[in-house]
C-alpha cells in the first residue's frame, strides 16, 4: 500500500491516523520553562541545547560576537547552528551581542591571569539581563568540567557568582 491508515476504535469514539513516527523522546519542549542558551559556535553548546530541550526546556540563544577577534564566518556558523537545532528545541530567538568593546576594556584594564574569567562573568551578566527581559528562568551553557583550564570548579563558581539565574550545564 502507498499509505497505511490506522483506525482505533474506543468506547467513546474512533481515532483515524497514519503510521506512528518515532520522536526524539523526552518531555514536550516548553513544559519545563524557558532558558537562554549560550551558543558559542562549537559543538558543546548545541548539544547542551538539545539535551535541555529533551527535558522540556524552551530555549532562546545568545552569541557574543567580537570582530575582529571573531570573524563574520563564526557569526554565520552560529546562525546556522541555531537553525539546525530549531527542529529539536522549538521556536527560538537568537540574540547576537556585539562584544568587542567589553572584551577590549577587560583586556586593557585587568591582569592577564583574570582575563578569561572576567570575560565569562561579563558575558553571564549580559546574558542574565537579556534572559530576564525574555522571560527566561535559567541560562544554559555547553561547559564541560576541565575541558580547558578555565573550566575548573573554582572558575565555574566564580562565573556563577556574577549573576543570579540558575546556570544549567547538562554536559557536566
Question: Which residues fall in each region the model found?
Answer:
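Conserved beta-strand termini and adjacent loop/short-helix elements that scaffold enzyme active sites
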Residues: 1, 97-99, 170
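RNA-binding accessory domains that recognize and position tRNA/RNA substrates
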Residues: 1-36, 46-93, 161
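A short acidic, often aromatic-flanked loop/helix-cap motif at beta-alpha or helix-coil junctions
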Residues: 4, 101-104
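Active-site adenylate/phosphate-handling loop in enzymes that bind or generate adenylated species
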Residues: 19-32, 103-104, 109-172
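Structural beta-sheet core signal
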Residues: 37, 61-63, 96, 141, ...
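Conserved G/P- and acidic residue-centered "switch" motifs that form tight phosphate/ATP-binding loops
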Residues: 42
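Conserved active-site and cofactor/substrate-binding residues in soluble primary-metabolism enzymes
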Residues: 47, 73-80, 97, 114, ...
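Histidine- and/or cysteine-centered catalytic micro-motif in compact active-site loops
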Residues: 64-65, 99-100, 143-145
Amino acid at each position: 500500500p502507498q499509505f497505511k491508515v490506522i483506525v482505533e476504535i474506543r468506547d467513546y469514539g474512533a481515532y483515524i491516523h497514519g503510521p506512528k513516527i518515532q520522536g526524539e523522546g523526552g518531555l514536550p519542549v516548553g513544559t519545563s520553562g524557558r532558558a537562554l542558551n549560550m551558543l558559542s559556535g562549537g559543538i558543546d553548546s548545541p548539544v547542551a541545547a538539545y539535551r535541555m530541550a529533551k527535558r522540556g526546556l524552551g530555549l532562546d540563544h545568545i552569541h557574543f560576537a567580537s570582530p575582529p577577534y571573531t570573524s563574520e564566518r563564526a557569526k554565520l556558523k552560529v546562525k546556522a547552528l541555531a537553525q539546525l537545532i530549531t527542529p529539536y528545541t522549538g521556536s527560538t530567538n537568537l540574540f547576537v551581542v556585539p562584544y568587542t568593546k567589553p572584551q577590549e576594556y577587560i583586556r586593557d584594564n585587568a591582569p592577564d591571569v583574570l582575563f578569561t574569567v572576567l570575560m565569562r562573568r561579563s558575558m553571564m551578566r549580559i546574558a542574565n539581563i537579556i534572559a530576564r527581559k525574555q522571560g527566561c528562568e535559567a541560562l544554559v551553557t555547553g561547559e564541560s568540567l576541565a575541558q580547558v583550564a578555565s573550566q575548573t570548579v573554582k572558575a565555574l563558581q566564580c562565573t556563577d557568582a556574577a549573576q543570579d539565574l540558575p546556570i544549567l550545564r547538562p554536559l557536566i
